[in-house]
Amino acid sequence: MREQKDLGLLILRVAGFLLVFTFGIQKIGWYWSALHAGKSFSSIGLAPLIAKMGFPIPVALAIWITFNESIGAFLIGCGFLTRLLAASLALGMAGALYTSVRLGEDWLRAALYLIIFITLILTGPGKFSLDHLLKCKKSPGAC
């Protein structure tokens, strides 16, 4: 039974990574294009939307969101720092859910991602993860 739970958590982690990572890569593309066009981060991508909605430090928030959805999602897929990064992504998805509802846009995707990351906060990454491997290496009796 434990193996099935761990396999389910692996599938959930990898699915969460694949679904969210596509948005992170898209955002990296926006910023890469902006840099090559001589534009600033504040003029392209998420930062103008964040500023328009009245959130503070829009450039920093845009960079944090991009990190979450790219590197953070990849590390969750690997099962590394899972709970910490899932908490960061859940916070970002809560913001995306709020923004989607406020703008009258489709909010279901943000809600689904939020559920995935809250589940990973509560359960942890499971046995098939780098977190588990590092835990076993540090304390062999705990595995």
Give the positions of each predicted feature.
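Cytosolic, membrane-interface loops and tails of multi-pass inner-membrane proteins
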Residues: 44-50
